[in-house]
């Protein structure tokens, strides 16, 4: 049960209605979280920003979706770990690839560029001490432009920070998520062991 209430039909504006409908079409962000966020003017601004960060920019959406899921499982957010972007699916992201996110370095499913982004997402989740190193950025520069690195960093920051907040809203508990996908507990244990 969410800790905040969803927006009521009588509270909708044309914009809040469109943001929720867009979430239903794209699959991410989930309409339930959009319904919570759109009860606040700054929440509406955040949903608009998140949609731009997620679906626009210079990085492929599929790459960002892989990083989002990797970080989400690391902080055991039931909601974030089970949400899937329809756009990323159309771009070729499969559940088999998602399973391989937790052994991305040894996977044949990912390019060197995708592995570099996933490594950065993994380090980002570990904390600022893990990414505040020249070598981290030298490794990224082999695969990404400065513009792409900025976008990747902003994206990981948003996923990590807002993901913690969304987890605390209890839209979907970790236990409920593990019922939907029993492999989540295994993946979370793998991430914790790293």
Protein language model features and the residues they cover:
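Acidic/histidine-rich alpha-helical segments that form the ligand environment
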Residues: 113-154
């Amino acid at each position: 049960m969410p800790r905040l209430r969803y927006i009521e039909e009588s509270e909708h504006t044309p914009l809040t209605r469109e943001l929720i409908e867009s979430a239903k079409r794209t699959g991410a962000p989930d309409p339930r979280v959009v319904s919570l966020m759109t009860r606040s003017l700054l929440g509406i601004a955040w949903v608009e920003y998140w949609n731009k960060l997620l679906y626009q920019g210079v990085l492929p959406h599929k790459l960002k979706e892989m990083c989002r899921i990797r970080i989400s499982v690391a902080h055991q957010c039931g909601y974030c770990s089970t949400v899937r972007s329809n756009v990323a699916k159309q771009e070729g992201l499969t559940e088999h690839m998602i399973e391989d996110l937790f052994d991305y370095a040894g996977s044949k499913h990912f390019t060197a560029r995708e592995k570099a982004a996933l490594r950065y997402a993994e380090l980002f989740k570990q904390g600022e001490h893990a990414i505040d190193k020249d070598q981290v950025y030298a490794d990224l520069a082999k695969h990404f432009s400065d513009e792409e690195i900025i976008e990747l960093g902003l994206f990981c920051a948003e996923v990590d920070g807002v993901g913690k907040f969304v987890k605390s809203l209890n839209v979907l508990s970790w236990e409920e998520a593990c019922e939907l996908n029993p492999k989540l507990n295994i993946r979370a244990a793998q991430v914790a062991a790293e």
